[in-house]
């Protein structure tokens, strides 16, 4: 890793000491997988997952605009990992290219394993805690955490996801 400044020039997120956020918990969970987030990534997670005084998400839409291969995917993975395990969210992770979607699936799959979750080859009603089921079919990847959330990885099409409800829509470019 390079030792010089790793902060993107776009970072203008305002977080005060009174800002409530689940982001610190997500960063801690991510760190339990032996992965580290850079300071700017941690700041983005805290902003994305900040809540208002009623405990609702502060931002219904959030965008990180960076060029390719600058660490956006790790921010998304940290958010998705926490959502699957603790928020029981139904997530749709979309990308323009199948390879991008597949890479995101592999990243999250690996993080779950590193977090101590055991994969089961078949979805069963009585799967133990800290386990998950994953469908690895290329282009139709899917992860379901026992007692937790679900995430579908897709490419964008004219009718993909129509009629379905998701708690979180991730548009990965």
Give, region by region, the residue ranges found by the protein language model:
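Phosphate/NTP-binding elements of NTP-utilizing enzymes
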Residues: 1-173
């Amino acid at each position: 890793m390079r030792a010089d400044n790793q902060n993107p020039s776009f970072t203008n997120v305002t977080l005060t000491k009174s800002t409530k956020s689940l982001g610190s918990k997500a960063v801690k969970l991510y760190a339990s997988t032996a992965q580290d987030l850079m300071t700017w990534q941690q700041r983005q997670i805290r902003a994305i997952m900040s809540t208002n005084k009623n405990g609702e998400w502060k931002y219904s839409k959030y965008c990180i605009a960076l060029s390719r291969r600058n660490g956006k995917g790790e921010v998304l993975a940290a958010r998705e990992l926490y959502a699957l395990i603790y928020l029981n969210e139904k997530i749709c992770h979309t990308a323009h290219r199948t390879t991008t979607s597949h890479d995101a699936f592999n990243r999250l799959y690996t993080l779950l394993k590193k977090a101590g979750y055991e994969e089961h080859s078949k979805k069963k009603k009585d799967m133990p805690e800290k386990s998950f089921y994953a469908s690895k079919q290329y282009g139709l990847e899917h992860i379901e955490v026992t007692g937790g959330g679900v995430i579908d990885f897709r490419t964008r099409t004219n009718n993909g996801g129509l009629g379905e409800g998701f708690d979180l829509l991730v548009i990965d470019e």
